């Protein structure tokens, strides 16, 4: 088990003494490929800026519906995705933008989906919570808490039947561990020895309820033990630690054909969604979460600078490149057409039926 210190702002009962005071430890960087390290940093920064632009567009009413951001969870997202092959499958909850990009989706099409435009990854019908792409094997994006778990187990069962060495990763938030589908899915996954890694991104608050107040066992990685599923915990702010832990469990699932559980301590910088003011957190907790010492992007950048991998000039170059790519994604979304109303009911049914949208609004059935 890779146990770590909990961020102070994460829980009403969290103690500052459990936190690691310094986040600039470079002990694990010396043996890493410098180009690979810079790539991790670049990907983390891109998610940060992409989500910031998403938040801005939402407040400008360019994006509608629900919207949940990965701000503060960039190291977790990038670390997890670094453990997967292109042929591995991914299921996530509604906080899925960063995962979609990391799994290989074009950021332009992800942004277009957020805008509800025709060129989006789900043709503008899914929006923020429902990123989906069979080519990259990112199969959602699910708006129902815990809804992705049984489906992920089904994909793992299909993998077993096909006798490939692919693995399914199923990401969720801490609140999902109290949903019935959690217990049912972990039970069947172990009974049938499915090649799946369950990942709980523990940001300590399920909407407005802390883990300490909702879970009798707040050490969530231990909750797999009821089903004899081995679990680990990792500091979700440490991209290398997340990558290593995820890689270890993914490869074990691949080789041993059995499920594993990974809990990643993380912290979202915003409320549950863009419109959530997070009044259930004290100002001290908010300030602590946003402090540089707990910011995963700043932490990793400082580590690379201290290790002479990333210069200040290099930081500026990466920042400029990322800014340009995010702007391109936003421009693409702005200029993408809206879906035609005639396609409203396309793909609603498994078997072809007349497109009912063509009856609107002139059809007498809609008349007063």
Kindly give the residue locations of the regions a language model identified:
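Mixed-charge, polar/low-complexity N-terminal
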Residues: 25-26, 31, 38-39, 43, ...
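Cofactor-binding active-site loop characterized by glycine-rich and histidine/acidic residues
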Residues: 52-56, 60-192, 210-216, 221, ...
